[in-house]
Every structure is written in structure tokens, then in C-alpha cells.
């Protein structure tokens, strides 16, 4: 395996939407960083089997709906 071509693999803390925290190894961020999830397996409709409404984080969903409201799909 070639050296110095792979990203740094380190420990981070992941915080799920319900506040549950766990530690994992990742290439995301830096050692000791915290990743706060907007959606996770406990809230995503694909894993819960429900038709939950997704939270509009940062206005993206509202912007999309406003942009395409006249199409009548």
C-alpha cells in the first residue's frame, strides 16, 4: 500500500438528534471533533417506515418548494 495517500483516520464524537452520543473512527474533521446529525436512523423515514415530515434545515426545503410551486406536480 502506498504511504501518504490516505486521509488521516481518527476518533470523533457523533451526536444523534435525540442527544445520544457515541465515539467512532472517521476521516471527517479532526481528532476529537463533534459531528451533530440533522437526521439519523432513529428519525429518517426510510428506516422508521413512516411518512414523517423532514425538518427544514437552513431553509433548503422552503426554497425548493417556492421555486417549483407553479409546476403542479
From Swiss-Prot:
Q: Name one GO molecular function term.
A: structural constituent of ribosome
The protein's UniProt keywords, in alphabetical order, are: Ribonucleoprotein, Ribosomal protein, RNA-binding, rRNA-binding
Where in the sequence is the signal peptide annotated? none
Calcium keyword on record: no
From the UniProt record, give one GO term of the biological process aspect: translation
Residues forming coiled coils: none
GO annotations of cellular component type: ribonucleoprotein complex; ribosome
Q: Which Gene3D superfamilies does the annotation name?
A: Ribosomal protein L31 (4.10.830.30)
Q: Which domain of life is it from?
A: Bacteria
Q: Give the multimer and partner information.
A: Part of the 50S ribosomal subunit.
Listed PANTHER family: 50S RIBOSOMAL PROTEIN L31, CHLOROPLASTIC, LARGE RIBOSOMAL SUBUNIT PROTEIN BL31A
NCBIfam families assigned: L31 (TIGR00105), PRK00528.1 (NF001809)
Q: Which family does it belong to?
A: Belongs to the bacterial ribosomal protein bL31 family. Type A subfamily.
According to its UniProt entry, the function of this protein is described as:
Binds the 23S rRNA.
Protein's name according to its UniProt entry: Large ribosomal subunit protein bL31
Q: Provide the species name.
A: Mesorhizobium japonicum (strain LMG 29417 / CECT 9101 / MAFF 303099) (Mesorhizobium loti (strain MAFF 303099))
